[in-house]
C-alpha cells in the first residue's frame, strides 16, 4: 500500500520468555519500514509546462500515488510536495515505476522509468529537469536521487531556445 504523509515505523527483536522470570528486552530502535518518495521540478522544467500534469509513482501494483502538477496561466505551476510512503513488497527485488504525463510546450508528453532494488528506509527524490541540447532542442530528463540508485532517463522534445542555453 501507499499513502501520503503516513510513515510506518517498526522494529523486531527475538527473545525468550521463561515462566516466573523477568526478561530484559534492552534497547529497540524503530526504523522506517517503507520507502519514501518526493517529487520536484526545476524552474526550467516548470517554464515548459503549458497544462496540468501528473506524476504517478507505483511500488505495489495497483496502489499508485498521484502527484499533481497544476498549470496556472501567467504564474509558475504548483505541484504536490508531499512525501509518499510505499510498502516494500518484494524484498531486494522491489521495483518502483515513475510515470509523468502532462502538457509540455503545448504537447502531451509521457515518460516512464523504473528503479529496481527499492528498500525500506530509502528516500528517493525524483526531479524533472529541463535539458537543452547543443542543437538548441529543449527536452526534459528525470533524475532520481536515492540511497540505492541515481538514474537519468532522457526524452528529446523539438523546441527552440534563445539566450546562452
Mark where each language-model region is.
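Tryptophan-paired
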Residues: 1, 19, 49-124
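Short, low-hydrophobicity acidic/polar segments
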Residues: 1-36, 42
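Structural motif
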Residues: 40-50
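Hydrophilic extracytoplasmic domains
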Residues: 116-165
